[in-house]
Amino acid sequence: MGDCGCSGASSCNCGSGCSCSNCGSK
């Protein structure tokens, strides 16, 4: 469970050790 699934500008699923552009670095 350390995946990042971004589908959309407001639909970001940030897990452990994931850094999305629209999500904060977690």
UniProtKB/Swiss-Prot annotation:
<feature type="region of interest" description="Disordered">
    <location>
        <begin position="1"/>
        <end position="26"/>
    </location>
</feature>
<feature type="binding site">
    <location>
        <position position="12"/>
    </location>
    <ligand>
        <name>Cu(+) 5</name>
    </ligand>
</feature>
<dbReference type="GO" id="GO:0046872">
    <property type="term" value="F:metal ion binding"/>
</dbReference>
<feature type="binding site">
    <location>
        <position position="23"/>
    </location>
    <ligand>
        <name>Cu(+) 1</name>
    </ligand>
</feature>
<feature type="binding site">
    <location>
        <position position="18"/>
    </location>
    <ligand>
        <name>Cu(+) 6</name>
    </ligand>
</feature>
<keyword id="KW-0480">Metal-thiolate cluster</keyword>
<keyword id="KW-0186">Copper</keyword>
<feature type="binding site">
    <location>
        <position position="4"/>
    </location>
    <ligand>
        <name>Cu(+) 1</name>
    </ligand>
</feature>
<feature type="binding site">
    <location>
        <position position="23"/>
    </location>
    <ligand>
        <name>Cu(+) 2</name>
    </ligand>
</feature>
<feature type="compositionally biased region" description="Low complexity">
    <location>
        <begin position="1"/>
        <end position="14"/>
    </location>
</feature>
<comment type="similarity">
    <text>Belongs to the metallothionein superfamily. Type 8 family.</text>
</comment>
<feature type="binding site">
    <location>
        <position position="20"/>
    </location>
    <ligand>
        <name>Cu(+) 3</name>
    </ligand>
</feature>
<keyword id="KW-0479">Metal-binding</keyword>
<feature type="binding site">
    <location>
        <position position="6"/>
    </location>
    <ligand>
        <name>Cu(+) 3</name>
    </ligand>
</feature>
<dbReference type="InterPro" id="IPR017854">
    <property type="entry name" value="Metalthion_dom_sf"/>
</dbReference>
<feature type="binding site">
    <location>
        <position position="14"/>
    </location>
    <ligand>
        <name>Cu(+) 6</name>
    </ligand>
</feature>
<feature type="binding site">
    <location>
        <position position="12"/>
    </location>
    <ligand>
        <name>Cu(+) 4</name>
    </ligand>
</feature>
<protein>
    <recommendedName>
        <fullName>Metallothionein</fullName>
    </recommendedName>
</protein>
<feature type="compositionally biased region" description="Cys residues">
    <location>
        <begin position="15"/>
        <end position="26"/>
    </location>
</feature>
<feature type="binding site">
    <location>
        <position position="20"/>
    </location>
    <ligand>
        <name>Cu(+) 4</name>
    </ligand>
</feature>
<feature type="binding site">
    <location>
        <position position="18"/>
    </location>
    <ligand>
        <name>Cu(+) 5</name>
    </ligand>
</feature>
<feature type="binding site">
    <location>
        <position position="6"/>
    </location>
    <ligand>
        <name>Cu(+) 2</name>
    </ligand>
</feature>
